[in-house]
């Protein structure tokens, strides 16, 4: 009798898991993105975050709800649609945000770090930050909504600080960021979640810097890419079939590409080079 009861319970659990997976598959269609306007989308994403043990989940949704609560005002927010249709009006998004806020919100790097904070290990060798983190640090130090992240600002600085390449051959630029992370004993303790970094080259100042960052979650049959586009710009999740789809996603964003003298950009998963634009 006990054996029959145990089998019955297992069957119920399996059916429940299958229903959850079916619901997720219906929502997460490959090639589609969302700004998480609907509560159903947010609740499903929260489940994914909890399953993968991401950090600061409540805080993330507080930031998200705060950004999404106003009328669109020409920013370009929407529910699920094909990823290549997500084109934002930067000025309208900023005006929309600043209508009710006196301090800037976080950006891509702050959001990515917040979600990964408890599963990242990194030695804090550097204590000073450069020009390219100036606005990030202003938010962390002056906006109370980001106090939790600011309490660990040395980890944040060491993860995203700029890199001088004045004395490095251009052919070696692609190795600078992963070598930096390795020198800091960087480790991300998950086999399903990873940090995606877009490293850009400022040829005027011989500098490499992390121009964009996001979180990639492996859902077994697809990937979910979670990002905040920029300061005072939307949050976006995108469903992709493979990591190669990230290359196409970033390729459509002209702001990541400098003049002809600039190398890259370089796309990394944690400390591994995924792609070098040439």
Model-derived segments and their meaning:
Residues 4-13:
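Sec-dependent N-terminal signal peptides
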């Amino acid at each position: 009798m006990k054996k029959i009861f145990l089998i019955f319970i297992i069957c119920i659990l399996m059916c429940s898991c299958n229903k959850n997976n079916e619901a997720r598959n219906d929502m997460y269609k490959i090639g589609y993105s969302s700004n998480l306007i609907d509560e159903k989308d947010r609740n499903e994403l929260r489940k994914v975050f909890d399953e993968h043990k991401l950090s600061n989940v409540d805080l993330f949704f507080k930031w998200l709800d705060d950004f999404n609560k106003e009328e669109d005002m020409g920013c370009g927010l929407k529910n699920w649609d094909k990823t290549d249709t997500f084109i934002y009006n930067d000025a309208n998004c900023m005006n929309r945000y600043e209508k009710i806020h006196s301090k800037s919100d976080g950006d891509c790097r702050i959001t990515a770090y917040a979600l990964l904070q408890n599963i990242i290990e990194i030695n804090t060798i550097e204590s000073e930050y450069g020009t390219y983190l100036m606005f990030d640090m202003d938010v962390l130090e002056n906006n109370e909504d980001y106090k939790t992240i600011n309490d660990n600002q040395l980890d944040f600085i060491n993860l995203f600080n700029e890199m001088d390449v004045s004395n490095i051959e251009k052919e070696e630029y692609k190795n600078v960021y992963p070598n930096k992370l390795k020198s800091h004993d960087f480790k991300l303790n998950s086999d399903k979640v990873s940090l995606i970094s877009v490293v850009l080259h400022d040829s005027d100042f011989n500098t490499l810097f992390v121009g964009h960052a996001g979180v990639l979650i492996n859902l077994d049959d697809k990937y979910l890419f979670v990002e905040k586009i920029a300061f005072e710009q939307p949050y976006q999740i995108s469903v992709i079939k493979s990591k190669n789809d990230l290359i196409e996603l970033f390729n459509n964003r002209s702001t990541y590409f400098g003049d002809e003298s600039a190398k890259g950009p370089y796309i990394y998963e944690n400390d591994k080079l995924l792609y070098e634009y040439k």
